[in-house]
């Protein structure tokens, strides 16, 4: 189970001086390279070649996109204190369709609340 998932609110704890301390939602998790794309963090300019589409309109130019950052440089935001926190797990017994199942739940270490 991943500690950081798509849609989580995270804070940047290290890296670029301009991005450090910023909070944003995780847009994408790249599990193969241990990186995440965070909304509004590490914005880079991408130069795209001018090309023609099927309808005849031209695309291309300079666009600003979010680049991935390493997962160790972000920390989950505690839903109660709104500060960065580590993530732990708690196992719970849940009954589904008449059968008992063991489920792992993510827990904020700072407040002990479910994430």
Curated annotation (Swiss-Prot):
One of its GO terms (molecular function) is structural constituent of ribosome. Keywords: Ribonucleoprotein, Ribosomal protein, RNA-binding, rRNA-binding. One of its GO terms (cellular component) is ribonucleoprotein complex. It comes from the Bacteria. Gene3D superfamilies: 2.30.30.30. SUPFAM superfamilies: Translation proteins SH3-like domain (SSF50104). Pfam families: ribosomal_L24. One of its GO terms (biological process) is translation. Part of the 50S ribosomal subunit. PANTHER family: MITOCHONDRIAL RIBOSOMAL PROTEIN L24. Belongs to the universal ribosomal protein uL24 family. One of two assembly initiator proteins, it binds directly to the 5'-end of the 23S rRNA, where it nucleates assembly of the 50S subunit. One of the proteins that surrounds the polypeptide exit tunnel on the outside of the subunit. This is Large ribosomal subunit protein uL24. It comes from Beutenbergia cavernae (strain ATCC BAA-8 / DSM 12333 / CCUG 43141 / JCM 11478 / NBRC 16432 / NCIMB 13614 / HKI 0122). The lineage of its organism: Bacteria, Bacillati, Actinomycetota, Actinomycetes, Micrococcales.
């Amino acid at each position: 189970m991943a500690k950081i998932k798509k849609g989580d609110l995270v804070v940047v704890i290290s890296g670029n001086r301009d991005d450090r301390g910023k909070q944003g939602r995780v847009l994408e998790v790249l599990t193969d390279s241990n990186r995440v794309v965070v909304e509004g963090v590490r914005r880079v300019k991408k130069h795209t070649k001018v090309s023609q589409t099927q309808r005849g309109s031209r695309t291309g130019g300079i666009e600003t996109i979010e680049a991935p950052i390493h997962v160790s440089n972000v920390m989950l935001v505690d839903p109660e204190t709104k500060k960065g926190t580590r993530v732990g797990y708690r196992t719970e017994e849940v009954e589904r369709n008449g059968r008992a199942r063991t489920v792992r739940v993510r827990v904020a270490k700072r407040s002990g609340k479910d994430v």
